[in-house]
Amino acid sequence: MRQEDIGQDGDQRLLAGLTGKIQTVTGLIDPEMLGVCLTHEHLLIDLSDLLPPPNTATARAFYARPVSAEAAAYCRNYSEFGTAHHALDSVETAVEELGLFKQYGGQAMVDLTLASIYRDPVGLQRISRAAGVHVVMGCGFYVAATHPPALSDWNEQQIAAMIVADIVEGAAAEEESRSTGKGVVYRKNTGVRAGVIGEIGCSSPLHDDERKGCVRPRGPNGKPVLVFSS
């Protein structure tokens, strides 16, 4: 997306075709097709970067164990338990669970996993098709601790360009970004388009980069913004 296309007039032109529609990972649908919808879920996610191992020997040994009934009480009290507790990475499990959701009347789900916590656009598309449930994908930037280092140097227009590109052109393949480091942005387009902005991270106090990360794109494109506050 060209920088000159980002701005109120450019955004309106590029996004005009989305007016009155819901954009899912498999395409546009009419709002009445959304039905019963969960608005903040994570079908595929990896929070490992936010939850480093503990710093004592006994805690590290416990941390390395798989999630089990024996460790259930610890898991409930300490969300940082174990590497296996940090990620949802099974398409098959997600399809199975969405099948149960559909069985009880669910029709749609909004997945708010972002690139810095390893969004998987193609995985979400596979899940949606296999389960027969509409999935709306988020875009934007999570809490500042997960931002690519270069984001501090980007202006609002550059950030807006990336967000609007996810909505209009399609999201990048995040495995490409992950393997080359978060400081490098690659636009290997998957063709899977975002339908909402978020979840935008809001630390306490709010970081300057978090503030500029969603304010500008919201105005011209009319997409809802979902936030996470800590």
Where do the PLM segments sit?
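Divalent metal-binding segments
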Residues: 68-95, 113-116, 199-206
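Active-site environment of divalent metal-dependent phosphoester hydrolases
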Residues: 44-46, 115-119, 144-145, 203-205
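Long, hydrophobic, well-ordered secondary-structure blocks that form the structural core
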Residues: 126-145
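Active-site gating loops and adjacent loop-to-helix segments of metal-dependent hydrolytic enzymes
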Residues: 45-88, 139-160, 189-193
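Histidine/acidic residue-rich metal-binding segments in metalloenzymes
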Residues: 23-24, 29-32, 95-103, 107, ...
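Short, ordered loop/turn segments at secondary-structure junctions
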Residues: 114, 140, 230
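Divalent metal-coordination and catalytic microenvironments
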Residues: 40, 109, 141
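N-terminal basic, low-complexity leaders that serve as flexible interaction/assembly modules and, when applicable
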Residues: 2, 7-77
